[in-house]
Amino acid sequence: MSDKIAIIGGSGVYDLFKKASKISVKTPYGKVETIKKTKYKEREIFFLPRHGPKHSVPPHLINYKANIFALHSLGVKKIYATNAVGSIDISIKPGDFVVPDQIIDMTKVRPLTFFDGSTTIKFEDGSSRKGVVHLDYTEPYCINLRNMYIKAVEDIGEMVYTKGVYVCSEGPRFETSAEIIMYQKMGGTLAGMTTVPEAILARELKMCYSTLCLITNFGAGMQEKITHEEVVEIFEQKTNQVKEVMKKIISSEHSSVKCNCIS
């Protein structure tokens, strides 16, 4: 149980870390001052609120590179994210849990890589990555962490969709109804704003990454007007379940089966 793990999320899991200490991490991409650190038995656990204190940073302005690099510099090997997302599949309803297995990137202006041609990043095992780096994203989420999430949700008695295609848009606005129709035709099932570039950057730094999505609304044109208040309300209704899932994750032994994340 020695692997350091990180949880990236929002208020739904923040209360798990009341006794944690707050730390600040300097990175080449900026300082990250919102990380909280705690310990369960021999495992170090870090929590990073991606939107900053009091949900103050919109998705398109999050310093994703600083966030992920900070966790890397702390020795984190596994990242468990949580997301509030919209459903663009009528069979997946608000209140449902989904552990997605695929991503469609529809972002526009976010930095998507650490490797700009001149960057060198060194790893604990003595290896390094530098220059122009082309990585395999056939499976953008770690299969081992996905299985951990699926088992944890099932263990608390909740139903979980074990696959889904997360369409990540720029935000902070919600999508148009025409965009939702396009995403559906592309094979998307979920609409969100933050898994890109988190999953991409984590893979570049040889960290395993998966996310647990909670459906908070249907996509534009599938219901009446979407509001942020509605999203918050649904998430708050499931806060206890999200916390129980994270407790299961924190206290569980993690798979030693080799995945594609560190190759």
PLM region spans:
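Generic hydrophobic/aromatic pocket-lining and core-packing "Φ" positions
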Residues: 68, 180, 196-199
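Non-catalytic positions within long, well-ordered alpha-helices that form the structural scaffold/packing
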Residues: 72-75, 184, 203
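Active-site rim beta-loop-alpha module in soluble metabolic enzymes
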Residues: 136-185
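Zn-dependent metallopeptidase/amidohydrolase metal-coordination segment
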Residues: 193-230
